[in-house]
A protein has these predicted regions:
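Conserved nucleotide-sensing/catalytic segment adjacent to the nucleotide-binding pocket
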Residues: 37, 49-97
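Conserved glycine(s) of the Walker
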Residues: 21
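Hydrophobic anchor at the beta1->P-loop junction of P-loop NTPases
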Residues: 14
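Post-Walker A helix-loop "phosphate-sensing" segment adjacent to the P-loop in P-loop NTPases
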Residues: 30-41
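A glycine- and Lys/Arg-enriched "phosphate-lid" helix/loop adjacent to the NTP-binding pocket
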Residues: 117-158
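NTP-dependent small-molecule kinase module
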Residues: 157-192
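Hydrophobic positions on the alpha1 helix immediately C-terminal to the Walker A/P-loop
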Residues: 25, 29
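The conserved Walker
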Residues: 17-18
């Protein structure tokens, strides 16, 4: 993609609870747009965990949707991961490379102010579809309990209110991947 005389190298942030299609959308956008890199915040969490311990950072060593208080757990993890996530974004900016960062840890309070090509919060689909997506192709070995699913729905409600508060668009992924890709191609920020 060219933007003027230089290649356009967008940075895209995709937030949302588990099962909203973040990984699938990121993969499709990379293919459609020829983007250079994609990373999920779950993988960033795994790297940070490798430099810590359950004694030092107990909240890092479990899924947010398995916590007794999933919202508090998500906020703690998100705050702890922010320096590592920002390092990835800053490296992409410094090197002039395109990047998609996707994951539940991209809270609007922490990232809505960033100058990126697009920042969207993916919405959970209706309940039965959401339950089925939680064990979809990008997480084939993940086992989900009814409690995990209910917590993922709570996180979705929290992220919806945060997206509204910070002016981050919330999108339900259906057959609209081309529309999202076009928004990124044009370099039109998804937030104000």
């Amino acid at each position: 993609m060219l933007n003027g005389s230089r290649p356009y190298k967008p940075i895209v942030l995709l937030g949302g609870t588990a099962g909203t299609g973040k990984s699938s959308l990121a993969n499709r956008l990379c293919a459609l747009l020829g983007l250079d890199h994609r990373i999920g915040t779950g993988f960033i969490r795994a790297v940070v965990c490798s430099e810590s311990s359950p004694e030092r950072d107990p909240e890092l060593f479990s899924f947010t949707f398995r916590a007794d208080d999933p919202i508090a757990h998500l906020r703690i993890q998100s705050d702890r991961l922010r320096p590592a996530i920002m390092a990835c974004i800053e490296r992409a900016q410094d090197e002039g490379t395109s990047l998609i960062v996707e994951g539940p840890h991209l809270l609007p309070a922490l990232y809505a102010h960033l100058p990126v090509a697009a920042y969207v919060m993916l919405a959970a689909p209706p309940p039965i579809e959401h339950r089925n997506r939680l064990t979809g192709p990008t997480h084939a070995l993940r086992e989900i309990t009814d409690g995990d699913w209910r917590n993922a729905r709570l996180i979705d409600s929290y992220l919806a209110s945060e997206a509204t508060a910070y002016g981050v668009p919330r999108i339900l992924i259906r057959d609209n991947v081309e529309e999202i890709a076009e928004m990124i191609r044009r370099g039109v920020p998804a937030h104000h």
